[in-house]
Amino acid sequence: MRKRIGIGALNDDEYLKQYEEVGNELIEQQSDEIASQLSTFQEALKTFAREHATEIKQNSQFRNTFVKLALKIGLDPFVSGSDESAWAAVGMNEFYYQVAVRVIEVCYATQMENGGLLSVSQVCRFLNEENEAFGHEWLRETDVVRAVDSLAPLGPGFVLEKIAGKQYIRSLPLELNTDQNVVLEAVEILGYVTISILRDNYAWERSRCIQVLNDLVSKSLLWIDSQGVEMAYWGASNLIDDQAQRFLYENF
């Protein structure tokens, strides 16, 4: 196909330029409209938060839905520190701060027993038992996770880690190597491991199994059960029952 030259080509270039300008104007206009609508929606959500503050704080399902909606429209509680934020309107900054303080206390109280690695589900269950007097379970695991996330500006003291698909709170500086992570994932699935289990499933040498198990025991992440035919290594966090956690917490 021959390329057009002369006046006709110039006209085509002018048309293309005009189309581009019109397109940019439309995009800018639509962007402004969307931004305006989003701002209106955010203000409406803040008003809703103020009107339903009590229910948001006390009803975990209602709060979880509200949080998801707020995050979708850009009201992130861990980014926005403004007094005009939806979280400030409903008092959720203070709420998550209070939850974080309680999470810290539970983690510190159980460090000697679990090596500073405690599952989010255990922390959530324990805190909810403390609130039975209110007649409802007002904390969800997502609340505990958000509370731990809110501690990030304070430094790396509390970190969320995922082991075998389950979330844990690490409250002690701890670097785990690949073998140690593999063993902890197996413990999360089975409840315990033995040298035979590790050798059969991962084809490890006996010396390798002993080394990694001893390392985890020294970190208080595994407890030894020598009553069976073969020595078993149980996950420390799985062995701490609720009564033990309550005792530790009350006497911390």
UniProtKB/Swiss-Prot annotation:
InterPro entries in the cross-refs: ESCRT-2_cplx_Snf8 (IPR016689), Snf8/Vps36 (IPR040608), WH-like_DNA-bd_sf (IPR036388), WH_DNA-bd_sf (IPR036390)
Location of the protein in the cell: Cytoplasm; Nucleus; Endosome membrane
Entry-linked Gene3D superfamilies: 6.10.140.180, Winged helix-like DNA-binding domain superfamily/Winged helix DNA-binding domain (1.10.10.10)
Record keyword Membrane present: yes
Cellular component, GO annotation: cytosol; ESCRT II complex; nuclear body; nucleoplasm; nucleus
Gene Ontology biological process terms, A to Z: karyogamy involved in conjugation with cellular fusion; late endosome to vacuole transport; protein transport to vacuole involved in ubiquitin-dependent protein catabolic process via the multivesicular body sorting pathway
Keywords: Cytoplasm, Endosome, Membrane, Nucleus, Protein transport, Transport
Pfam families per record: EAP30
Membrane topology reported for the UniProt record: Peripheral membrane protein
Family the entry assigns: Belongs to the SNF8 family.
Subunit structure as annotated in this protein's UniProt entry: Component of the endosomal sorting complex required for transport II (ESCRT-II).
UniProt function note: Component of the endosomal sorting complex required for transport II (ESCRT-II), which is required for multivesicular body (MVB) formation and sorting of endosomal cargo proteins into MVBs. The MVB pathway mediates delivery of transmembrane proteins into the lumen of the lysosome for degradation. The ESCRT-II complex is probably involved in the recruitment of the ESCRT-III complex. Negatively regulates meiotic spindle pole body maturation via indirect regulation of the pcp1 gene. Required for efficient entry into pre-meiotic S phase.
Name of protein: Vacuolar-sorting protein dot2
Gene: dot2
